[in-house]
UniProtKB/Swiss-Prot annotation:
Function, in words: Component of the Mediator complex, a coactivator involved in the regulated transcription of nearly all RNA polymerase II-dependent genes. Mediator functions as a bridge to convey information from gene-specific regulatory proteins to the basal RNA polymerase II transcription machinery. Mediator is recruited to promoters by direct interactions with regulatory proteins and serves as a scaffold for the assembly of a functional preinitiation complex with RNA polymerase II and the general transcription factors.
Domain of life per record: Eukaryota
Compartments in which it is found: Nucleus
GO biological-process terms attached to the record: negative regulation of transcription by RNA polymerase II; positive regulation of transcription elongation by RNA polymerase II; positive regulation of transcription initiation by RNA polymerase II; RNA polymerase II preinitiation complex assembly; transcription open complex formation at RNA polymerase II promoter
GO MF, one example: transcription coactivator activity
UniProt lineage: Eukaryota, Fungi, Dikarya, Ascomycota, Saccharomycotina
Protein family: Belongs to the Mediator complex subunit 19 family.
GO CC terms of this entry: core mediator complex; mediator complex
Signal peptide annotation: none
Protein name as catalogued: Mediator of RNA polymerase II transcription subunit 19
Length: 201
């Protein structure tokens, strides 16, 4: 069965008539083997092939990565559930993340297309998507890494128009830049204050 028989055309967001050249190197390949790094990887592996513990992460290494985001002494996975309350979403295999749709013989092309579209939409609905958890995770990033988000004074999260509550409405609250735990007026409001002063003069 060819791809066109079960994948609707709306899946192709890039020009479908254009030829596609596979990326090189292909990230789906075993790049360690491709670049002949098997010996080195075995020497620094933290687990053996049979699953037993091998090389521990040296404390001196830990000191070198203390300022890196996403560092883990214990790597999160599905089994240890170190991913927190969103672990069940993070570590699911792709087929597990959505209900599978099977085409019955009496299903028309339009019914089949609608069924596939409903599956896509379900990814953004409960239980696949918890908007409160998403909002909590984004706010944690904002608090944990303030310099990454505040370096550019022209960047405002609200400009991204994230629909965090699933209502279709963006956050209309007044934007504020946080600095050392205090609120500071945005550049726009400072400009308005300057205009007010000139009027008084």
């Amino acid at each position: 069965m060819e791809m066109e028989e079960f994948a609707p055309s709306y899946y192709y967001y890039v020009e479908p008539e254009m030829g596609y050249q596979p990326q090189q190197p292909n990230p789906m390949e075993d790049l360690i083997t491709v670049y002949h790094l098997d010996d080195i990887s075995r020497q620094v592996a933290r687990t053996n092939e049979d699953g037993t513990k091998a090389v521990k992460l040296r404390k001196s290494y830990k000191n070198q990565i203390t300022d890196l985001s996403g560092k883990f002494s214990s790597i999160p996975n599905r089994e240890n559930r170190k991913g927190g309350e969103i672990a069940h979403i993070l570590f699911q295999n792709n087929p597990d993340m959505m209900n599978q749709v099977h085409r019955s013989p009496d299903m028309t092309d339009e019914q089949w297309r609608e069924a596939l579209m409903n599956v896509d939409a379900s990814l953004f609905q409960a239980p696949n998507m918890d908007w409160e958890v998403c909002q909590s995770v984004l706010s944690q990033f904002d608090r944990s890494y303030p310099t990454e988000f505040q370096n550019d004074p022209n960047f405002h999260v609200d400009d991204l128009a994230f629909d965090l509550d699933g209502t279709g409405k963006s956050n209309a609250k007044k934007r504020k830049n946080r600095s050392n735990g205090s609120s500071m007026a945005t550049p726009n409001s400072e400009m308005q204050d300057d205009v007010k002063r000139r009027r008084l003069e």
